[in-house]
Amino acid sequence: MTAAVLLARTERVVASVDCALGPLWHPVRLAEDIAMADTIGGGRLIVTLGLGYRPVEYELFGTPFNDRGRLMDDLLETLMSLWSSPEFTPGPLTRPHPTVFVGGSVRATARRAARHGLPLNLPSHLPELADYYRELCADAGHSPIVVMPPPRSRGMVFLHEDPDQAWAELGEHYLWEARVYSGWSGGEVHSFMHGSETIETLDDVKAAGRIASCRPSS
C-alpha cells in the first residue's frame, strides 16, 4: 500500500517492492493489492516475491517454514490465474500481468522463475545462478530476464535539511539497523542489502554507502 500511495502522488517514479515474502500473504489479497497499485501507477509497479530465510517470520504468522517453497509455487499459480481471469475485477492495468520478479539466492529460485516464465532477481554475487536460470529458460522456450543489483544499490535514502545533522541525530539508529540486518547473514545466507561485511561502527555504515542522508531539492 505504501507503493500505491507513492505512485498516486507521482507521475514518473517507478515503485519497486523488493521483496514481499509471498508465502506469508493470502493469494487473493495479494493479487488484489498488486492489481490496484499497478492500475494507480499506470504500470509503474515492480514486485519481487521471495521466500525469506528467517523462521521467526513464519512463526509469527503460524505458517510452516518448511512449506514455503510449495506455498510460493501455489501463490504464483494463483496470481497468474486470477490476473488472467475476466471474473477478477478490477484487474491490473499491465497485461498479461503486473511486473513480478522471483527473488532468492538458491537454485530452486531459478527453477521456479523459469518454470513460471518470470524474471529473476538475484544478489550480484551469484552469476552462476543467473547462468543456470538462462539455461532453464532456453529449455522452456522463455526469454530470460535477470537483474542482479549490487548491495550498495539496495540502500535507503533519508531526507534532511542538514545531512550532517541527520547523521548526528539518527546515526545510532542507522547503526542499529545495519548491525541487526547484517547479523542475519551467515553460511549460505547473505543479506541482500548489507552483504556479508561486518558492521561494527557508524564509520562502517558510512563506508558501506548503503545509507544516504541527502538534502531535499527545492
Model-derived segments and spans:
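Internal, glycine-rich beta/alpha segment that forms the wall or movable "lid"
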Residues: 23-116, 121-136, 140-147
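N-terminal beta1-alpha1-beta2 module of alpha/beta enzyme domains
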Residues: 1-10, 14
